[in-house]
Amino acid sequence: MTKEEEILNFLSTNVFDPILSSKTASKALKTGVRTTIYRLKQRDAKGMVQYFWAALKGTPRSIKFAELMKKEGVKRFEDVLDEFRERFTKYLK
């Protein structure tokens, strides 16, 4: 498994897949998840980790998306922060 696959697998398992398979998640939320996956796939492992940290730091788009995720009661990047940091920060080097 490549570094990129490892990161995407982790985020898919813990954040993305539960939303995409949810019968109650809004269309806007599912579209946002698909867009995030698309953007992540365009990056190498270092870029994926940087994208994750930028989303947590807050961009205008990521702040609104995180608010929507919170409103709908789904797991967010913030919820997997500790494990993500432990597993993937090494890819920034």
Positions of predicted regions on the chain:
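Short terminal alpha-helical segments
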Residues: 1-32, 81-92
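Short cationic/low-complexity microdomains
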Residues: 2-11, 51-68
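Amphipathic alpha-helical binding modules
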Residues: 56-93
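Amphipathic alpha-helical interaction modules
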Residues: 17-60
